[in-house]
Amino acid sequence: KPLLAWTIEHCLAGGVDSVYVSSDAEGILDVGEKYGARSIKRPEEISGDEATSESGWLHALEVIEGDHGKVDWILGPQVSSPLRTADDIRKGLSVARSDLYDSLFSCSVAEDLFIWENRSGSLKSVNYDWQNRKRRQDIPRQYIENGSFYLFRPEILYQNNNRFGGKIGVVEMEFWKMFEIDSIEDLKMCSTLMKEFILMEK
């Protein structure tokens, strides 16, 4: 099954009203339509590796609102993150509809992750003070933006040209769901995790 198909199926089963695939490639649009998505032909000037997700979302939003009227929320899933489930999407939509937030991101909880940064050859601790190391239970809850999906109101995108704005919230996911596919090694790892945690449940 194509990688794109997993994301489309997650969105449809998770309760997304309308699912669109935006691309300048006919082959990708054909796959999207095969699995139940509608197509939006993306202009060449906002396609390719240099294009931002925001530019694609803005174009798609203008097309959709021009054809169908105002949109309440935008869900932007990452196709290379196949380890999410329809329940994760459903949970995200539920949080969005609570009207407590203006933008949301899927996340994994960062437990026992102490991050260091190399600044011009000098190592600096990023998310804790190594000179005042705290007990695990005393550390504030920290989140990893796992990129699986984002939810935001259209006005946030229009005003900020950014997926984030207003009051920002999170949709927590299990840690193993944060992995994405960018290499052959990633593909092997995600395949193993999917077989162990997702396909075994079906």
Model-derived regions: residue spans:
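Short beta-strand scaffold positions
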Residues: 21-23, 151, 181
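N-terminal glycine-rich phosphate-binding loop and ensuing alpha1 helix
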Residues: 1-22
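Short active-site oxyanion
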Residues: 15-20, 102, 176-178
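Hydrophobic helical membrane-anchoring modules
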Residues: 170-172, 177-202
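Short phosphate-binding loop-to-helix
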Residues: 12, 20, 26-75, 84-91
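Histidine-centered beta-alpha loop that forms part of the nucleotide-sugar donor binding/catalytic region
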Residues: 44, 78, 108-109
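Conserved core of the sugar-phosphate nucleotidyltransferase
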Residues: 55, 73, 82-167, 172-174
